[in-house]
Each structure stands twice: as structure tokens, then as C-alpha cells.
Amino acid sequence: MRIRIFVSWKPRIGEFRVHPFRWLTITILALVLAACSPGAPKDAEVVIPQGASIARAGEILEEAGLVSASSFRNQARFFGSYDPIKPGEYKIEKGMDAGDILALFQSGKTIQRLVMIPEGMPSIMVWERLMAEKRLKGEIPVPAEGSILPDSYAFTTGETRAAVVKRMQAAMDKVFAELWAKRKPRTAVKNRNEALTLASIVEKETAVPAERRTVAGVYTNRLAVGMRLQADPTIIYPVTKGKPIGRRILRSEIQAVNDYNTYAMAGLPKGPIANPGKASIAAVLDPEPNDYLFFVAKGDGSHIFARTLAEHNANVQKWYALRRERGEME
């Protein structure tokens, strides 16, 4: 524990010259008292609100059973710097004294909480996750689909949800600008909306990193020859806003005409169906040069690709046979 002297009165002029031993006695006594003053008896987390005074911070510490309000005030009065204390959530470690805590509050080294947005999460679920985080405050609308970069984001207790969303969207803007500048002539997309839309489809179609450019190549080829994309996730999006459907897709949903269903329309949907990650965006801006037009699941999370409809139909039958073995089909 660091020793600090708390002296609340000043000597009269000449007093130190006349009574040097009195001052020595006072100094020694102050050192002893400071040494005996206990630090925080436990680890704890405290929140210092915006605009809190030294006195209020001391009260918060005392209420938490960490250090007395008076010792904290005295530390700030006699030995603290002029730096203001900063709001936020702080980790107080066992043994920290008033001076340690004051320095921590002035440093602004708050606890950094994390909110994780996985690749392919739709905006409605991003909104739900942020609204469920009770350490954040404020209302927000559902962010525009495709505007959020999936990643882990740090925040502090009491921060606004709007501020967190703003960082997420700024991250997407930055990453997209970097990738767009490196796009290859082969890409099928002409602008940001098209790029994020196709990237969101790639994101939802495969979770295998090595397949992203291959899947992007398939869709690039289909767009080039005027074939419908026929991507199952585009059927689901109008039904659930991107949430898992939890059942088999209905025939009526496959045939539904809307702005997203790529079984019933040519070209790209009107906008993204999820928030794509950096790798999927990069894949559609630099798709694999291949001549595949079809792909179907293999049953292990990956896909098998085909150049012709005959090859594809054979692969589909293998997939159906596997599903029957698993009891997923009759």
C-alpha cells in the first residue's frame, strides 16, 4: 500500500522554525495513520455516472464498502491532480487505497464490455441483442440491413446503444471502402448495395471459409447468363426478417413473388438479407473463376458443385439419400 499524508491545516508563519519537532511528530503520526488505513477489502465494480463530483464518487465507494468517503475526498483535496474524474464502470481491486482509486477514476480506464455480432446476423437480431444488453441505454431503430460489420465491439456501462451502432456502421463503411478499392473486373456487382446484397447471400449459403469465393463464383456465373440465383435464404428473409425459420420451407413460400425471393425473380434482391462479414464481401468482389452453376449440401456443412444440371441432379439425389438415412426424409 502506498502511504499518503492527509493534513487538513496549515502552520502559522515561522511555526516550523520554532517547533520543528512538533512537525516531525505530526508527520510521523500521519504516516502511521495512513499506513494503518485499510485499502479496498474486496474486488468490486462501481459505476461513476456522468457529471459525478468527487464527493459523490466517495459516497459510491463507501456505499460499496470499499473505502470511506472522507478518505477519498481528502486524497483528492490534498494529493490529487487537477484532472477530473471520468464516468464509466471501473474495476476496483482488493487492496487499492483512496489514492489508487482516484488515479484510476482520473485515467478513464473503464471496464470494456463486449457485444459480439456474428457473421450473417440479420439486423433484427442485432437490434434484439443490443436492446437486451442492460448496461447500454437509449432506444434505437432496427439498423439498415447490411449496414453493420460483424465483429466484437467494446462498450462501457451507461453508453448509448446509438453510439455502439454508429461504431458498427463506421466499421462497415471503412472495411467496404477498402475492399471496393481492390475489386476485380470479374465481379458481377456494380455498387455498394449490390455488393452487400450478394455478399449477404454468400454469407447465409455457406459457413465454410474456403467455399466463399467458390459460391460467389457460382452466383457470378448465374448472373452473367441470366439464370435465377435460387438461393434458399432469400425465400426465408421476407418470412422471418432473417431469423431461423425452424421448419421446412413451404411450397407457397418458394413460389411467393416479392422483392427478395430469387426463386421467383431474376437478378439480385432489392437489398441485403443479413449483415455479411468481411470475407464474404471480399469474395463477391473477387469471385473464384470457375464454370460452376449449381451446388448442393454434402451433409457435413460443405457443398458439392456442378457444371451441368445433370451433374447437379445426381448430387441432389445423393443428398436426398443421405437425408433418408438420417431419418430427415421419407
What are these regions (language model features)?
Residues 127-142, 146-330:
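Bacterial extracytoplasmic/cell-wall-associated proteins, especially those involved in peptidoglycan
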Residues 24-34:
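Bacterial N-terminal signal peptides
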Residues 2-6:
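Extreme N-terminal basic, low-complexity initiation segments
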Residues 37-181:
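Signal peptide-directed extracytoplasmic domains
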